[in-house]
């Protein structure tokens, strides 16, 4: 652990432990999360193969947030950076100026045993500390592979990062651990994109799969064709399927929405175990996935990492709650993933592969992206979306692209016996095969 970052966190904790005061109000308890480190990036400039690479760039940064409880019962939230200990008086005045009253404000948690999970890859740390040649090598490999198939327009970006995270509080919590990340984004002809993002480097197999998928899928999406219309089987790729689940299920599991009545689900629904999916489907949260972005031993509030199952065998079990809404809803606080996957959609039956599903579709679509998912009414479960580059499947083969609109109820899809989880070669979450209404778009 770098001495500079350790000293920064310890100095800040020392100042807060001294019970500083503003206008007669003292800080009586506190917690903060602080992080800092290096990021290296490179890319293909202007999105054109054969042109100059975007020069590798290095950036160093630090930041975080603090939560204070004052002697007069008020609370404050504030931001942190590397200057916070030196400018402590001014920062404290800012935090006090933003103080507010909240009868349900969360208490500071005492330290608890933290689970072990790998959050850093030494191979990534070595690249950040040394030469970023691997970032260029990934881009060159992508350039050569796609150029072989005549693709002339590509956007690509690669990055690696190493950092340190400190979660301290006034009750003695002193969690400090390293983090790393590695990512590669590749898009071709403004038609199709794939990415890799974990806390570790990609394997040669993972990198090869990404390149081959982009090389194989992009040409198909370059051929305009007529889409199937009406009620159609539509295969949602994993990233898009996760977007639907996040929008219509995870958003409605949020404790704040449940408590205030803005969710499709009520507290009573959780108490009685309302069925919201088929019995063979479950949704879990897991922060103990080694070297995934989700990996995290402790949240910013001091909640230990772990596993939780908000939906088990299709039935509501517990909302997703922070400390405040854990108290209000009378459910235990939820472990907080450090990144993706934010949740895991699971089925009880073995999954067919995407290739198997496509080969058996006489008429259907595969979707990689849609427009407007974030703007849908999550509480209703209903959607009306446009897919500008829908992959048309006819006779078990991908035959081109079409622009379509699709509409339906995602709640109904998750109860439909025809809905199917589908295994893809990448990611921890599956794709989804749903039956939905498809109409043409000009």
What feature does the model see in each segment?
Residues 270-442:
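Dual-mode signal for accessory low-complexity, basic/Gly-rich regions
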Residues 1-293, 312-315, 397, 435-442:
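Active-site bordering "gate/hinge" segments
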